[in-house]
Amino acid sequence: MGRGKIEIKRIENPTNRQVTYSKRRNGIFKKAQELTVLCDAKVSLIMFSNTGKFHEYTSPTITTKKVYDQYQKTLGIDLWSSHYERMQENLRKLKEINNKLRREIRQRMGEDLGDLSIEDLRGLEQKMDASLGLVRERKYHVIKTQTETYRKKVRNLEEQHGNLLLNFEAKCDDPHYGLVENDGDYESAVAFANGASNLYAFRLHQAHPNLHHDGGYGSHDLRLA
C-alpha cells in the first residue's frame, strides 16, 4: 500500500515547525554537497528560519561573492548600482545639511553676513534674541538654584550653632558641671570669655602658698591649665 499524499501547508505548532525546518535544511545542504562532488557544480545556498537565524552553504570551489558576480554577469544586471546610488544621494543630502548648519553657526558668530538680505538679517537677529533669552533664563535659574542651596546650608549651620549654644548654656547653668574631684584637686572644664564659645580649663592646686588669700581658696590656688 502506497504512502498517502502529504498536504503542503504551514505547520502551526512552533516546535514541530522548527524540527521540520532543521531536518529539511540538513537534507537540502546534503543534496547541495552531493551536486558539488558528483557534478562539479558551484552551489551557493542562503537560508533564514522564521526566527531570523541564518544558514548557508557554498561549494568549496567558489565564494559567495564570485557567485553574485557570475550571476550579475550572466543576467547583465547590477545588484549594487541602485543601492550605491541611494547611498550617494543620502550622502549628498547630509553634506548639504552639514554645510547649512556650519554656515548658520558662522553667521551667529558674526561671520559670512555679506550675502544676507535685510530680511535674512532680521530673521538672524530674531533667532539670536530668542537664543539670548533662553541663555539668560537658564543663567537666572542656575543662580536661583545655587542661592537657595547656599541659604539652606547657612540655615542648617545656624541651627546647629544655636543648638550647640543652648546645650552649652544648659550645662553651664548646672553648678556641678565641669567640677570633678580628683585627689583633692578640683577642675573646671568650661567657661565663657567675652560671650564667645572659647573654652578654658582652670585647676585648683594645693601648691604655691604665696598665692593663698585669707578667706579665699584656702590651701588651693587658681591657674589657667
Curated annotation (Swiss-Prot):
Gene Ontology biological process terms in this record: flower development; positive regulation of transcription by RNA polymerase II; regulation of transcription by RNA polymerase II
Pfam families listed in its UniProt record: K-box, SRF-TF
Domain MADS-box: 1-61
Residue span, K-box domain: 84-174
Keyword Ligase: no
UniProt cross-references to CDD domains, sorted A to Z: MADS_MEF2_like
GO cellular component: nucleus
PROSITE patterns hit by this protein: K_BOX, MADS_BOX_1, MADS_BOX_2
Keyword Lipoprotein included in the entry's annotation: no
Tissues expressing this chain: Expressed during flower development in stamens, petals and carpels. Expressed in fruits and seeds.
Keywords from the UniProt entry: DNA-binding, Flowering, Nucleus, Transcription, Transcription regulation
Predominant subcellular localization, coarse grouping: nucleus
Localization of this protein: Nucleus
UniProt-recorded Gene Ontology molecular function terms: DNA-binding transcription factor activity, RNA polymerase II-specific; protein dimerization activity; RNA polymerase II cis-regulatory region sequence-specific DNA binding
Protein purpose: Probable transcription factor involved in flower development.
Name this polypeptide is given: Agamous-like MADS-box protein TM6
Encoding gene per record: TM6
